[in-house]
Every structure is written in C-alpha cells, then in structure tokens.
Amino acid sequence: MYGKIIFVLLLSAIVSISASSTTEVAMHTSTSSVTKSYISSETSDKHKWDTYPATPRAHEVSEIYVTTVYPPEEENGEGVQLVHRFSEPEITLIIFGVMAGVIGTILLIYYSIRRLIKKSPSDVKPLPSPDTDVPLSSVEIENPETSDQ
C-alpha cells in the first residue's frame, strides 16, 4: 500500500513539474481564444462604452494581451542563433542542479515516509521466549500453600 502512495507522490511531482514548464508556452500561443465580438477597435472617441459589456456573461471571453516574440530571421530564411547570458558549462550546471534538487526532494519525501512508517524500538515489545517463564528444572514442585489445606 505504501508503495502505491510513493508512486502517486512521484507521479504528481512529475506532473506538476511538466505542467509548470508548459504553462508559459501555452500563454504565448493562445491568441485566438478571444472572440471577435468582444475585441474592440481603438477609436479616438474616449466616451464610447458600447464595445465593453457592463457585466461579463458566461459565453464571452475576457481580453488577453499576449506578446509573441519570434527570433529574427536572416534573408535566406534561416533563424539567427540567440545569444544567451550563460555559457554552456553554466547552463549544464543549472540543469544538473535543478535535476539534483528534484531528485533530492523526492528522496527526502521517501525517507520521511519510511521514518513515519518504521516503528521506534520503544514501541516494539520483544516477544517473550518460552523458556523465560518456566523454571529450568523438569520436576514439578507443588505449591506448599495449597497442599497444606
């Protein structure tokens, strides 16, 4: 049962990491979600309020301003390589650092779950051995109190 819990925790960590990395891309590509009836054109009349509804309705979509930046292209159609702030070894160290952090977090969660599951020595009572309660002699001795009566 605990193996399933650990599996679900690891799976949820992977899903949350992949979801956080794809939300930024989704924000830049969702320009077509605004309906045409809701987009207002810029006019010089500052008192024109009929392009914006007073209360939003369920079928209308709020405006989203998205700026998409494309890398510059050369005249022959090939893209120009972007210049990064970090060198290749620094980028490699950053990637390995993030990977080590994620793996370390997963192992820390696993270790803490194992510590919670494992019983402490004070909670575990040793099983009594059968020889400790019985005297070592094979001869039975009667209790003198019961025999005198």
Curated annotation (Swiss-Prot):
InterPro entries: Glycophorin (IPR001195), Glycophorin_CS (IPR018938), GYPA_B (IPR049535). The keyword Ion transport does not apply. Residues 20-90 are extracellular. It is found in: Cell membrane. Glycans are attached at residues 21-23, 29-32, 35, 37, 40, 43-44, 51, 55, 62, 68. It is a single-pass type I membrane protein. The modification Phosphoserine is found at S137, S147. The chain crosses the membrane at residues 91-113. GO terms for cellular component: ankyrin-1 complex; plasma membrane. Residues 1-19 form the signal peptide. Residues 122-149 are annotated as: Disordered. Its main location: membrane. Residues 114-149 are cytoplasmic. It comes from the Eukaryota. Keywords: Cell membrane, Glycoprotein, Membrane, Phosphoprotein, Sialic acid, Signal, Transmembrane, Transmembrane helix. PROSITE patterns: GLYCOPHORIN_A. Belongs to the glycophorin-A family. Homodimer. Component of the ankyrin-1 complex in the erythrocyte, composed of ANK1, RHCE, RHAG, SLC4A1, EPB42, GYPA, GYPB and AQP1. Interacts with SLC4A1; a GYPA monomer is bound at each end of the SLC4A1 dimer forming a heterotetramer. Component of the ankyrin-1 complex, a multiprotein complex involved in the stability and shape of the erythrocyte membrane. Glycophorin A is the major intrinsic membrane protein of the erythrocyte. The N-terminal glycosylated segment, which lies outside the erythrocyte membrane, has MN blood group receptors. Appears to be important for the function of SLC4A1 and is required for high activity of SLC4A1. May be involved in translocation of SLC4A1 to the plasma membrane. This is Glycophorin-A. It comes from Pan troglodytes. The lineage of its organism: Eukaryota, Metazoa, Chordata, Craniata, Vertebrata. The gene is GYPA.
